[in-house]
Amino acid sequence: MDLSRSPYNSINIHIGAHYSDKEATAKRFCEAVDRLSPAVRQRLTVENDDKESLWSVPELVESVHDEIGMPVVYDALHHQFSDRGLTGWEALELAVDTWPDGVRPIIHYSEPRRLHEADPSVSPRNHSDFVAGPIHTHGHGVDVMIEAKMKEQAVMQYRQQHPDH
């Protein structure tokens, strides 16, 4: 890769499990990251999960960022399932504060398919084809990655519907 070695050119991952002991899992995760090459470590970011039992933004800040300095990517849809009592704004603030100076934080935005379809059998975690928005960044200069099934078409439609964003 010819991109600079920074979280701006990130490799985004989830911890994704806890094996009945979050503290021990976080420790093993951080130790594994420490064994990676600097080129990889400098690009890694970690994202909150979409299950209540897994990793929320505040848990990632405390267990990963505060230990090894890895930036946290805030995923707005995932936050709905693992909010730990925080509003979206509060979780976004926590995640943004983990990013190094001079690097624009990345956030993920998607909407549940159920929001756009009247099919109760669809999981609330399934991404919709498009997003209606608006996407709230609460004044932060962040890069928003839209996660939608229609990919680039979803981004183009959003930009047409929200030209000031």
Which stretches of residues belong to each language-model region?
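A general structural signal for well-ordered alpha-helical packing
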Residues: 57-61, 77, 89-92
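Conserved, mostly hydrophobic/aromatic
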Residues: 44, 75, 144
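Histidine-acidic metal/acid-base catalytic patches
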Residues: 70, 81-165
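Active-site acidic/histidine proton-transfer and metal-coordination neighborhood
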Residues: 1-71
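Active-site-proximal loop/turn and secondary-structure-junction residues that shape catalytic pockets
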Residues: 15-19, 48-52, 76-80, 111-113, ...
